[in-house]
Every structure is written in structure tokens, then in C-alpha cells.
A protein has these predicted regions:
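Short glycine-rich or small-residue beta-strand-to-loop segments that form or flank ligand, phosphate
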Residues: 2-10, 66-70, 95-99, 163-167
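N-terminal phosphate-binding or glycine-rich loops at protein starts, especially the Walker A/P-loop
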Residues: 1-44
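Glycine-rich oxoanion-binding loops at beta->alpha junctions
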Residues: 43-99, 104-105, 137-151
Length: 169
């Protein structure tokens, strides 16, 4: 079996760890893994390549997504774009797809699944707005970062005897 992995949309902390975990699970089952570079945009450009275990080793500590991310209006708005994406994945030998991303990314994965390509969605968004999930990848880090920044601003506000307003998202 050969699966492809794609990261798309806005990035969230932990996306690379999710990518590595998906690939490691596939390898443990004896499957091959393909990486789709630059999200749905890269998928429609045919940017699909094999991944080996050694490549994944350093991914966990890196921010962002090592595969890149990109949106595609052709994919989002046209049925032909989705059909072309499936054709490219199948030409590369992929029998399934793992999509790591937020709501729009997972909607794209659902569309591919409905067109016959088995697809798994991994929710990764700091917005934590994916229906049916309690926490998505990235939200804990985002909230802890906000709390840390607010603690620092509080010290500054106290020193200047001022109130501060912090807007998040």
C-alpha cells in the first residue's frame, strides 16, 4: 500500500510532528509514503515525491510545515481540479491520502474521499474550530503562547499604571 501526506492551509504548531507520526505509522505497517509539496496547489502541480524514514527524523522540532503549504482556487472551486488531483495521486501510486490542516483543508480531503480516494483528515488549527473535535493540533501551544505574552504585557502595564488591550485571532 502507498499513501500520500499533504499539509495545507494555515500552519499550526505540531504539524510536522503529525506528519512524522502519520508516516511512521505507515512505515510500521510496511506501506510506502509519498509527500505532497505545497498543499493543494502543489498537488495540482504534481509535486508528489517519495519519503524515506531518514528524512523524517528531524521534523518534530521544526516549526511550520516542512512540506510547505498552498491553496488552490482551481482545487477549491472546480470539480475538475479535484478529479485531476485524484488522477495525479493515483498516477504516483497513492491508494489513500492523509490531509493535515484546518477546516478548509479537511473539506478538500472530504471532497476527495467522496470522489473515491480514501482520505483521513488530521485537524491542525490554532482556531480549534473543527466540528467533532475537542482539541486540534496547535491550539494548546497557541493558548500557552498567548498566556505567556499576556503575563509579560501585564508587567509592563503595571509598571506604567496603564491598562493594555490584547487582541487574539
Amino acid at each position: 500500500l502507498k499513501i500520500a501526506v499533504l499539509t495545507s492551509g494555515g500552519i499550526a504548531p505540531g504539524v510536522n510532528a503529525a506528519l512524522r507520526a502519520a508516516a511512521q505509522e505507515a512505515f510500521s505497517r510496511g506501506w510506502e509514503v509519498l509527500a505532497v509539496e505545497e498543499g493543494y496547489y502543489g498537488l495540482l502541480e504534481g509535486e508528489i515525491r517519495p519519503v524515506d524514514r531518514a528524512e523524517l527524523w528531524g521534523y518534530v522540532q521544526l516549526g511550520g510545515t516542512v512540506l510547505g503549504t498552498g491553496r488552490s482556487s482551481e482545487f477549491e472551486e472546480k470539480e475538475e481540479g479535484k478529479e485531476w488531483a485524484i488522477e495525479l495521486l493515483r498516477d504516483a501510486g497513492a491508494e489513500g491520502l492523509v490531509v493535515i490542516g484546518g477546516g478548509g483543508s479537511l473539506s478538500g480531503g472530504l471532497a476527495l474521499d467522496e470522489l473515491g480516494l480514501p482520505t483521513v483528515g488530521v485537524p491542525a488549527t490554532i482556531d480549534n474550530d473543527i466540528l467533532g473535535t475537542e482539541l486540534s493540533i496547535g491550539v494548546d501551544t497557541a493558548l500557552n503562547t498567548v498566556a505567556e505574552v499576556i503575563d509579560r504585557i501585564k508587567d509592563t502595564a503595571t509598571s506604567h499604571r496603564r491598562a493594555m488591550v490584547v487582541e487574539v485571532l
